[in-house]
Swiss-Prot record:
Belongs to the universal ribosomal protein uS9 family. One of its GO terms (molecular function) is structural constituent of ribosome. GO terms for biological process: translation. The gene is rpsI. Coiled coil: none annotated. PROSITE patterns: RIBOSOMAL_S9. This is Small ribosomal subunit protein uS9.
């Protein structure tokens, strides 16, 4: 019993010495008032800047319709705005490198979601429930030696 008393006294002394201060992370906002975030998917990395505007989206100095030919890609990229009901309220400027079209689409989607989360903290719960803030960590499995592909093996003959 006396050991417990000594330990609790030590803990109480430590707590009374230094007040507990929670550090809030600095939001990535540049001088012009844009929210910055990076999104990743497969080998693609997207840098996204979000600012209050009229809903214009620019990807690598092209409009979103010019960069992504398929309408389904555009709809999936606009998903965070649909969930948070902020369509035509933010302008998006992003640069994407690496990967293919599908990976770039996922990277932009992830970056926009993270930037929206920084712009308004009440969007966090909505975006988290939609699964847009979690990074999709699936990447291509490497090819193993002695095999044709990552999982495919050469034909086996018993005799």
């Amino acid at each position: 019993m006396p050991e417990l008393k000594i330990k609790t006294e030590k803990v109480e002394k430590q707590l009374t010495k230094e007040p507990l201060v929670l550090k809030t992370p600095k939001e990535k906002i540049d001088n012009s008032g844009k929210f910055y975030a990076t999104g990743k998917r497969k080998n693609a990395i997207a840098r996204v800047w979000l600012k209050v505007g009229k809903g214009k989206i620019v990807v690598n100095k092209k409009t979103i319709a010019q960069y992504f030919p398929s309408e389904t890609y555009v709809k999936t990229i606009l998903q965070p705005f649909v969930l948070t009901k902020t369509i035509d309220q933010y302008d998006v400027i992003c640069t994407v490198r690496g990967g293919g079209i599908s990976g770039q689409k996922g990277a932009i989607l992830h970056g926009i979601s993270k930037a929206l989360d920084k712009s308004a903290p009440d969007f966090h719960v909505i975006l988290r429930k939609g699964g847009l803030l979690t990074r999709d960590s699936r990447v291509v499995e490497r090819k193993k030696y002695g095999q044709r592909k990552a999982r495919k093996k050469t034909q086996f003959s018993k005799r």
